């Protein structure tokens, strides 16, 4: 929901196609939301500022693709536990509409950043794979972002998620930006990153972030352009095992960076 909110650029937004029920043959991953998950998804959307949520779907298709899947109603056309839970959330909103109206999400001190170039390049690299390591899959960048979300949340802070193109780099004081395994750092963002750090923002970078520019040139060759901002430059990355530990307690995956 944060991704949608930031890309709405301050405009009202809805969240659509929230999963209503079980999937069997469709969907990338077999999954059925529990009633508790449904409530969590709805309240998360509301807390992010969404003005509405649309499920996919109320009832299942009867034939062909997605037949018997995704519905809030069961096969007997009775409300599922998910639909009953959604009704409870709607009831709270109806009873306390005036209290919710006009509320806006409080800005978080930590923002997790992604960029489209990283997703495109990661997907392109994954097309040639013969092995199954997570860090080399097309989903690696966004899974790293999800892992960072879990890690920051475990500290007691709920982070925001934003595209680098919509992040307010000028609002640096007291803020932390995390770039989790974003394999590309397009040239347009480099002066913004430097300005953010220079003006007091804290920057945390993980994985192979900045390995490429937007044209898939390796940035670590011929002088890393963000050396002064990052405080160091990488001389090389070495495969160190699928899972290993950096120092005494920092879990890592696949590559070890040598400074």
Give the location of each predicted region:
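A conserved amphipathic helix/loop scaffold
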Residues: 34, 180-259
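Alpha-helical scaffold elements within enzyme catalytic domains, especially in hydrolases
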Residues: 3-6, 44, 151, 192-196
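Loop/turn elements at helix/coil->beta-strand transitions in domains of secreted/extracellular proteins
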Residues: 9-13, 48-53, 155-160, 173-175, ...
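Short low-complexity, flexible loop/linker segments enriched in glycine and/or proline
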Residues: 29-32, 67-72, 174-179, 218-222
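Short, solvent-exposed loop/turn segments at secondary-structure junctions
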Residues: 19-23, 59-61, 116-119, 166-167, ...
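Generic beta-strand/beta-sheet core signal
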Residues: 16, 56, 113, 162, ...
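Hydrophobic targeting/anchoring helices
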Residues: 1-142, 236-241, 245-251, 255
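A short, well-structured beta->alpha microelement
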Residues: 149-170
